């Protein structure tokens, strides 16, 4: 399929772009006809200008035409007279305001359309077709092309029967979609009839190899990591710190700080608890001594002057009075036991 189809249409969106950029729903037919007429007008009176291609772009009520040429001086004319004439003809044809841009082709030796046009001009001036084809191939290979194929079809050399001949040099991979292949076609008008000239020029692969692509992706990832991060943003309400990046970072650092100081705090608390627990055990006998002298502390409670106050009618006062006899009774019960304990040796002696 790649041997038959036009390389530009076969690679649209991959290595080649559309030469007409516009969108129309109901006027599609009219716009296509206008584009064909514009390109015919450019090629009819500009044979010596070396026009490579014409790009057409439409906007609402406006038309932009980009002319790519190897000889911009011929298209512009003296003091821009030729450019003004072309602009006027385009405005008459389309009825819209036209913006005309004339662009120069930097390397015409590798442009397929210009190479085909050069071969056709030589055939029109009765140059041998083999000589013209080989000269074009040598010039293109010196200009940086990786491969070229030139084909001529018609009554070659004035023969009665038409035939096709082609010459090729280098690589021309027509089936490879990633290959950047330029294609050009031009017709030479001779005394014996028309001779068609087709040129394919291979300029290299546009899509990179897998290793190069992986290296480029790795470099892009590295640049993304090194890219400076933007500052913290405020939360949804603008006042909450927990929803911001700074608040999260602060909370995270606090948690880490607590986790690091927790063992020290636990050891300090355990040591303090150990000292407190040992202190009462050592002073246990001393603590029992004041319990024996409890009547001295209860004496003022029984004679509390608060009972004579008007507030003595409240419920807490009788409770205090009732507790005082209970403590006294317990103390009185304890004292006989204490008195009886020293008497036990006397019974033993008897």
Curated annotation (Swiss-Prot):
Question: Per the database record, which ranges form the KH type-2 domain?
Answer: 38-106
* A single BP term in Gene Ontology: translation
**Which ranges form a coiled coil?**
none
The answer to whether UniProt assigns keyword rRNA-binding to this entry is yes
Keywords of this protein's UniProt record, alphabetized?
Ribonucleoprotein, Ribosomal protein, RNA-binding, rRNA-binding
Instruction: State where composition is biased (Low complexity).
Output: 261-350
Q: Care to name a GO molecular-function term for this sequence?
A: mRNA binding
A GO cellular component term found in this entry reads: cytosolic small ribosomal subunit
Mention any Pfam family matching this sequence. Ribosomal_S3_C
Q: Does the keyword Signal apply?
A: no
Quaternary form?
Part of the 30S ribosomal subunit. Forms a tight complex with proteins S10 and S14.
Q: State the PANTHER family in the record.
A: 30S/40S RIBOSOMAL PROTEIN S3 (PTHR11760), SMALL RIBOSOMAL SUBUNIT PROTEIN US3C (PTHR11760:SF19)
Q: Its biological function?
A: Binds the lower part of the 30S subunit head. Binds mRNA in the 70S ribosome, positioning it for translation.
Instruction: Identify its protein family.
Output: Belongs to the universal ribosomal protein uS3 family.
The name on file for this protein is Small ribosomal subunit protein uS3
Give the organism, scientific name.
Frankia alni (strain DSM 45986 / CECT 9034 / ACN14a)
């Amino acid at each position: 399929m790649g041997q038959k189809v036009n390389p530009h249409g076969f690679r649209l969106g991959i290595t080649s772009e559309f030469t007409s950029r516009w969108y129309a729903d109901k006027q599609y037919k009219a716009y296509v006809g206008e584009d064909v007429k514009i390109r015919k007008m450019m090629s009819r009176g500009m044979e010596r200008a070396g026009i490579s291609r014409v790009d057409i772009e439409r906007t609402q009520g406006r038309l932009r035409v980009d002319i790519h040429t190897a000889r911009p001086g011929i298209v512009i004319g003296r003091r821009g007279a030729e450019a003004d004439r072309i602009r006027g003809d385009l405005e008459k044809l389309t009825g819209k305001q036209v913006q005309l841009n004339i662009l120069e082709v930097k390397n015409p030796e590798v442009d397929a359309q210009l190479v085909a046009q050069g071969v056709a001009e030589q055939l029109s001036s009765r140059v041998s077709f083999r000589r013209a084809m080989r000269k074009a191939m040598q010039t293109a290979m010196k200009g940086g092309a990786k491969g070229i194929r030139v084909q001529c079809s018609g009554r070659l050399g004035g023969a009665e029967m038409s035939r096709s001949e082609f010459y090729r040099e280098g690589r021309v991979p027509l089936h490879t979609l990633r290959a950047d292949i330029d294609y050009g076609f031009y017709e030479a008008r001779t005394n014996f009839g028309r001779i068609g000239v087709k040129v394919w020029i291979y300029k290299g692969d546009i899509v990179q190899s897998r290793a190069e692509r992986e290296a480029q992706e790795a470099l892009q990832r590295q640049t993304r990591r090194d890219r400076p991060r933007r500052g913290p943003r405020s939360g949804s309400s603008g006042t909450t710190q927990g929803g911001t990046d700074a608040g999260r970072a602060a909370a995270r650092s606090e948690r880490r700080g607590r986790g690091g100081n927790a063992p020290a705090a636990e050891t300090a608390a355990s040591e303090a608890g150990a000292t407190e627990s040992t202190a009462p055990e050592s002073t246990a006998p001393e603590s029992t001594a004041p319990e024996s002298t409890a009547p001295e502390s209860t004496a003022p409670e029984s004679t509390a002057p608060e009972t004579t106050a008007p507030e003595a009618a409240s419920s807490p006062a009788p409770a205090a009075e009732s507790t005082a006899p209970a403590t006294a009774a317990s103390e009185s019960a304890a004292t006989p036991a204490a008195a009886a304990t020293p008497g036990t040796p006397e019974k033993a002696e008897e």
